[in-house]
Amino acid sequence: MGKYLLTLAVIFTAGHSSINLSAQTVLETVQVEAYRLSSPEALITGALHIVDSASIHSFAASDLSTALNGIPGVKMETRGDGGSRRLHVRGSALRSPYSVRNTMLYYDGFVLTEADGNSPLEWIDPDLVQSLSLVSGPAAASFGGAYGGALNIYTPSFTKSATHAWVHSQAGTTGNNDLGINTRISSGVDIGFENMGVSISAIMTDNPGYRTWEWNNKTQLNLRFKYFDKAGGIHSMLAGHFDGDWALPGAIKQSQVDTLPTASPGADYNAHVARLRDIAGYKFEKTFNSGWEFSTSLLGRFTSKTNPYGTSQFYKGYKEESGSGYSLLASAGKRIYEGNVWSLDFEMTVMHLDDKIHITELESEPSELPTGIIIPMRYDLTMNAQQNFVSTSWVATRLNNFRIEGQIGLSNRSRTISGWTPGYGGLRNRSSSPLYSDNVSTLHSIKKTHSTILPRIGLSWEVAPGYSLFAQASTGFSDPTAFELVNPEDGQISELDSESAFGMEMGIRAQLYDQVKIGFTAYQSSVNSAILQVVQENDAIAFANIDGGLIMSGLELEIDYIISDQINIRAYGSQTLHHFGEETDHAGNSLPGSPRTSGGVQLNSNYSWGTARLNTRHIGETPLNNEGSSVMDAYSVIDASVSINLPYDMSLELGARNILDAEYSAWPQLNGVYGKFYNPAPPRTAYLSIRWGI
C-alpha cells in the first residue's frame, strides 16, 4: 500500500491555483479577518484556516466537505453526495446528529446562523464561493456564540467595467449503476460598471445516490448587487431562493453493510426532507476621514420544511416546520493611538438575532383520505428565540512583532416555547385543544433566559522573522436548537439549559525556508451542561443536559512545502483526546464521533496545459456510542483529478473519488440502536466537469 500511495503521489503531484481575474481594475478585494480584527498573518493570535477557490472547487465538489475536511480538527460528513450534512469542529459532534450546530456561519458579512444556533450550511454552494476562513474552538467574544468556532464565506469580487458570464456542467457516477448518474448545471453572469456590480446565478443539481434511498436535488437562485457611492460608502444587497429535497436512507447494521450496503430502511417510510429557504439582505460599509471604519448588515430569512418520519419510535411520523426571522450586525473600529513603538486599536460589535419557528408533528403523513379522518397530532409548538450580543476589542501592537488582544462580550439570549403537547393525568378539553381528541393535551408557555459574560484574551509574538508564537483563552456557549425541543419518548418539551465552554490554545507558525511553512496548535476545551444524545426506553434518540462536563484536547499540525513553481504539497493531521468528564456516567470514555487520529496529504501541480491533483485522507478509529463498546474501523480515501485548459476560456476536469474502493461509513449514526451505526459511503466513482467563461 505504501509503495502504491507513493507512486500515486508522484504521478498526481499538484499545485495551488485560484480563480484568475482579468487584467482590468478590481473594485474590491476580499479581506479575511481573524476574530473580527485585521491582522498580519504572523500576528494572528489563534488558529485561523483559510481555504482558496482551488480547494473549494476541486473534485467536483457539491458542498464544502472536500475543502473543510482538509482542515485539521474538522470533519464534515454527508449522507450521499449533496445530501444531509453535518459539521464537527474539535469534538462538537454530539450536538450535530442531523445538522450544523455549534459553528457560527457568516456570508459576506451577513449572519446566516439563526437565533437557536442552527446554521444552514446547505445554502453554501461551491460555485458561489471565492474563499472561506474557519476559526476553531470557543470564540464567543468575537462571533457571538458557538464553541465550535466560526465559518466565514466570501464570494467573488466584481471587476470594474466588465461583463463575465460562466457555465458549469458536471456529470458523474454514483457507485450504483442501476440508479443513473448525478448531474449539475449552474450558470451566472457578473456585470461590473464604473461604480457598481451585479451578479445573477442559478444552480440545479440532481443525484440519484448510491443507496436505494439516498437521492437529493436542489434548485438555487442567487442575486448580488454592490454600489460605491461618491461619499465613499459601499452598499451591498443580496437575495436568494433555495429549494432542496434529500432522502433520509437510515442507518444499517454491520451485517447489512457486509451483504447489502445499499439497503435503506428509510425508503419504507418515505423518509426525506423538503426544504425551502429565502433570504434578502442589505449591508453598508464606509471608512470616514476621521479613521473610523463602520459596517452594518441586515438579513431577513424565511424557511419551511416537511419531514416525513418525524422523530418517533421506528421512524414513523410526519413533521412540518416553518420559520422566519432576521439578523442585524453592526461594527465600528479605529486606530486610536499610533506611536513610534506602540499602536492601539479599538473595535465594537453589536449583533441581534430574532427567529420564530413553528413545528407540528403528526402520527403519520397526511394523505388523500376521505374527509373526516383525523390524523393524531403529537405536538404543535412555536419557539421564539432572540440573541443580543455586544462586544468590544482592544488591540495593542508593539513594533509590528508583538500583539495582545483583549475582547469582552455580553450575550443575552431568550427563548419562549408555547403550544400543545400530549398531557397525562389532566382533564380532556376537546374544545380548547387542537390536538387529537382521544388523548389528553397540555398547553405550554415556557420561557428561558441566559445572560453570559464572554471574555477573550490572545497574544502573539514574532520571535524572529518568519517564526511566531501565539496563545489565547476564550469562552463559548451553545443554546438548544428547535430540533431539540421535544423529548421523543413522551412528547413533552425538553427544558434544556444552555451549554457553556472554555477553551485555551497555543501554537507556533514557522517559515522554515522559503519553500516550507508549518503550523502547530495544542488546544483544550471544556463544556459544562453539555447537551448530548441519550437513548430513551422506546429506543428513540433524545437530548439531555449531562452534568460532569466534556473535555476536548488535541494537537493539530499543518505543513506546506513548495517543491517548485508548479508543485506544492500540503500535509495535515490531528490527534484528539476527547472524553467525558470524571463526574459523568461515562467518565473517561472517548466522545462518539471524534476520530482519535485524522490527517491527509494534498498534492497539487499547475502546468501550462492544466492542473493535476491528488487528495489523500485518513480517518482513524471512531467511537460510535457513549459506552465505548462500539468502534468504527479506520479508513483511508484517495481522490485524483486532472484539469485540462481548452480554447475559448474552457476547462475540462476528469477525476475519480475513492479510487482504492475503500469501504467506510461517511456518516456514522452515533448511539444508534440495535447496532444501526452505519451509512455506507459510495465505492469508486468517476466524474466529468466542464467550466466555460464567456
PLM features: residue spans?
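Short acidic/polar hinge/loop motifs at secondary-structure boundaries
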Residues: F110-P138
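Extracytoplasmic beta-strand/coil segments of soluble accessory domains associated
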Residues: S65-F110
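N-terminal periplasmic accessory domains that precede
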Residues: L64-S65, R86-R90, T103-Y107, S119-E122, ...
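Flexible loop and strand-edge segments within Gram-negative outer membrane beta-barrel domains
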Residues: R211-E214, F228, G232-G281, G300-G323, ...
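Transmembrane beta-barrel wall of Gram-negative outer-membrane proteins
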Residues: D178-P249, A271-E293, A332, I336-N340, ...
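Membrane-embedded beta-barrel scaffold of Gram-negative outer-membrane proteins
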Residues: K283-T287, E293-N307, E462, S468-G476, ...
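Surface-exposed extracellular loop regions of Gram-negative outer-membrane beta-barrel proteins
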Residues: D245-A247, A251-T259, H352-I373, S414-D438, ...
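Gram-negative outer-membrane beta-barrel transporters
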Residues: H168, E338, T397-N401, N412, ...
